[in-house]
Amino acid sequence: MDDIYRKAMKAQVGELAEEMDELYQLVSTGQPVSRVIYRAVERNLQLLTEACIGIAKHSLKGMAKEVPSDARQAFAKLRQLGLDHSGADWNRIIGMRNALVHAYLNLDAERVLDVVRQRRYQVLLDFAAQRLNDAA
């Protein structure tokens, strides 16, 4: 993985981690969540997923492996190579990302908020940290 990309993504993922922790605090109070906070949750989940997709593809590229255009295939290839130990359900994660981008009017807001309330986004942060700190 290119050092410039790695450095930029570490900074980006670090910012997203801080923002997700702030959002966790805001949505876990038991109080109603404002539309602005909810939109921030949606956007940050989208950005974090996009970051992981980019990291997966750049990891493969850095190893001179063929990079699938489909994100699910990129994660599957990393798993086949023994380079994704996150346990993440990438099909569900990418499905949610697609819904956030393309079907946002039909989303169940409580399901989206539960991802944050239950800190299920942590698997994305863990994957990113593992891949960005790896030598490849």
Regions inferred by a protein language model and the residue ranges of each:
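Solvent-exposed interaction patches of small proteins and small membrane subunits
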Residues: 1-136
